[in-house]
Each structure stands twice: as structure tokens, then as C-alpha cells.
């Protein structure tokens, strides 16, 4: 029995390799529901990213469908929200930021970031220049970063990208030493409660990146109430408040929904995914 199983902690098989088996008769590819969300965190204390209009422009300038199809072969679906609607409490009717370079350009124009003769945007003599930090151990993050760099350039946004080895990348993220940085939600069964709770303290980059939000105190207060409330209706309303604020603040740039992937011989039956990303129900698998 040989099963290749890739989840958050095991990337032995990437999307490129799995895609080669999608039309195979001998092997079957299994995909779970979304387990976590691949996204970019924008630092709201940054001089340029402190402006919600710039953050919203980047949301509209990001073609998630092309990232899903071109980089993940459709194995990871485009993400419109920080948490998938299948995550408990997270189906709260948020409106996605539709991909529209026209909307992105309009937002930047109205915010004073206008195109110069060099086709780059500037405001009061300052260029619209950002930096994106990625984990150099992740080929995928580098590929996405290079794609976004080229796409944003078409709008007159200068974005440098740089990778750091995992520990340095994590240290800088936690300290808030970034303009923009790749991140992944905690995933099931920790989302949304545990990952939101961690935003109230400098555990990861969220805390530092949220310091420029006008509604930071309001968000933290609602999260604290979620942790103590035993009334399900109240909890749902509090979650809706937090998720709506974070979505409208536009500091989280969702890219794709990560899922667990299984590649196995088609003679094997009973292969399915467990209730969380680390649960592999081997006991249910069998050969006839």
C-alpha cells in the first residue's frame, strides 16, 4: 500500500506533479474541502499601505483565478475571503473583491497615486513602491510573488520581492518587519477561533500588521467576547462583526484555499479526508 498524501506540513508532491495524474486510469487524485487559506498580510502601519484605498486597489488588482489555474492547476480554488465559507461561523455574506484592473486604477487615481511619464505611480513625489516577503523554502510562494510583481507593474506599482529562510521569515513576520508577507491560516480545527484569538497578541505577524487599523480595538474586543460567550446567536453575530471589519479593512489578501491532496492507486477504496487537516483515516481504506 503506497499513498502520497500532502497537507500543510508535507509538500513532497506539488501541484505540478499531481496534475500529471489527473487523467490517469491507474491513479486517483483526491482533494479535501478547504483546510486553510493562502494569503498575503499587508502591514497597515506602513506609510503607503496605511491607506485603505491602496489595500483595496491591490485586492482588485489580484487575479486569483489565474493563480489557481496557472500555478495550482485548479487544485487550489481561488479564495475570496480570509476564511472559506465552509469554516464554522464564517459564512457571513461578505462581498468578494472582484478582479478588475479598472477599479484598482480608479482607486489609486482617486487616492492621489497617479501615473507619471515613466508609467509608474507616485504621490507628492513619492513612488508607489512596496516589498513582498516570502519563505525561500517555498517554490510556490516565489512563483506567486513573481506573478504578482509583473501584474502590479502593469498598473504602475513597483513591488520588490525577497525570500528569506523559514526562521528568519517567521521572525520578521512576528516583529512586523515587512510591507507585505505571505501567510497561511491556521486551518481546521483551529479556525476561526484560535487564529482570531492570536491576533490580539504578538504571536504572528497579524498583531503588528493590524496596528494601523482604526477599528483594531473594536476587533480585539469582539474577539475577546467570542472566547467567553456561550450564546451561539451572540457568537455568530460577533464573528460576523469581526470578519466583516477585517474584510472591509482589506489588509488580508486571500489567494487560494489550501486543501489536502491524496494520490493513490485506483484499486484502493474508502479513501477520504478526516475532520481536520492532520487526520488521515487509514482504517477506512481497503482493497477488494
Where on the chain are the PLM-derived regions?
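Short, solvent-exposed loop/beta-turn-alpha elements that line the ligand-binding surface or hinge
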Residues: 18-35, 41-51, 88-109, 116-128, ...
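Append "and occasionally in soluble cytosolic enzymes with long acidic Gly/Pro-rich linkers
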Residues: 30, 49-150, 241
